[in-house]
Amino acid sequence: MNTIKKQIEWDKYIIALSPIFLIFYISNETYAIDYRAFYLAGKSVLNNLNPYLNHISLSSDFYGPINSELSKFSGWKYPPLASYFFTPLATLPYELSKNIFNLFSLLSISLVTFFIIKKRIFHLNPYSLIIVGISFPFLATISRGQVEILIVCIALISLYFYKQDKIFLSAALIAIMGFIKVFPLLLSL
């Protein structure tokens, strides 16, 4: 009986994760239309303003492609507490804030991928990671500055804690997901 575990070939996975540098470059060069809404909501909270209303009449810093000059509403469609999550990033200039958010998104998905490989939760083909990394849905999610990657990472960590019988931690992470976006709460029912 062979009790020797198969070694993980890390060199293949490191090469497979190389599109992250391309993705970060692309995210640096794009406007991140969806992230702009998060940024403006955080900026509104910092200025004691309602994140759901358009404040462009107060300052051009509140301009976003969604709210423009004519709209009464800002385009913010997330729970009120989500705007508080983005207040630290709203203290920074938009470009720097956007890049930090995208870096955090890329690091979180990389760490979850590393965790899956390390714990051998299931087998990931290294070459499939390259395909996913350069696929249009993934690139579009990053270039627009969407929060779905963070939501998926939090959901996977929550599932891991649930499998480890750490129900409180799992439930707390699901609650955090609900503060950012309501839809994951519906899935957890």
Pin down the residues of each PLM region.
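Membrane-interface micro-motifs in multi-pass membrane enzymes
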Residues: 79, 139-152
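Transmembrane and membrane-interface helices of multi-pass
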Residues: 116, 125-138, 142
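TM-lumen/periplasm interface segments of multi-pass membrane proteins
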Residues: 7-117, 140
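Residue-level signature of the transmembrane alpha-helical core
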Residues: 103, 130-133, 157, 172-179
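Transmembrane alpha-helical segments of multipass membrane enzymes and assembly factors
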Residues: 112-127, 164
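Hydrophobic core segments of transmembrane alpha-helices in multi-pass, intramembrane catalytic enzymes
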Residues: 109, 147-156, 178, 182-185
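Membrane-interface alpha helices of multi-pass inner-membrane proteins
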Residues: 168-189
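Membrane-interface transmembrane helices that cradle and orient dolichyl/undecaprenyl
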Residues: 148, 158-169
